[in-house]
Regions:
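Well-ordered secondary-structure scaffolds
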Residues: 1-172
Length: 172
């Protein structure tokens, strides 16, 4: 018999009957996951996560690119049928999620990228500008994994379409 001391603490994962190799799994590191909402943990789901009770609303867009973002929400357009322009996007919007009205053009979106705005929510966007933003033509696809500084959520569709009154008022 030979006694060996493991250089690490852990749990024996497996022992090979052929080679005698012992695989030891180190203690798992806890993973912290942001909830993106404030609230109260009402249930713990073993090995999966938690349920958070919160006063919240769910706004679903028609289309989005850039994944999840967080920041203070600021209404920038004066109405739900106003276009979000370059002039509307200020340095003070850096790190924020801004809400426009009916549309954001490619130049205004580039301004938001340049200023590191975290997200833009508008009624519409030009489909043909997506290729310039992404660097490739987007077909039918699951979106949200694009590596973009500024996420874009389009609530109504392609083109200049005023944001629904209900959505705009909720965000306002």
């Amino acid at each position: 018999k030979t006694n060996l001391q493991s250089p690490i603490s852990g749990t024996i994962e497996s022992i090979s009957d052929v080679t005698g190799q012992i695989v030891i799994r180190e203690k798992p590191l806890p993973v912290e996951v942001d909830a993106y909402v404030s609230g109260r943990v009402s249930d713990i789901i073993k090995d999966e996560g938690v349920t958070v009770e919160s006063d919240a609303a769910y706004v679903q867009g028609i289309f989005g690119i850039g994944g999840e973002a967080r920041g203070d929400l600021e209404i920038v357009s004066g109405s739900r049928d106003s276009e979000l322009t370059i002039e509307d996007i200020k340095e003070s919007h850096s790190g924020k999620i801004i809400v426009g009205g009916s549309f954001i053009g490619i130049d205004a979106y580039k301004r938001a990228l340049e200023l590191k705005v975290r997200g833009v929510v508008v009624g519409g966007f030009n489909y043909y500008d997506l290729e310039e933003v992404l660097g490739y033509r987007l077909g039918v696809a699951i979106t949200g994994t694009e590596n973009l500084e500024t996420s874009l959520v389009v609530t109504e569709g392609y083109g200049n379409i005023k944001m629904s009154e209900r959505t705009y008022n909720l965000l306002k």
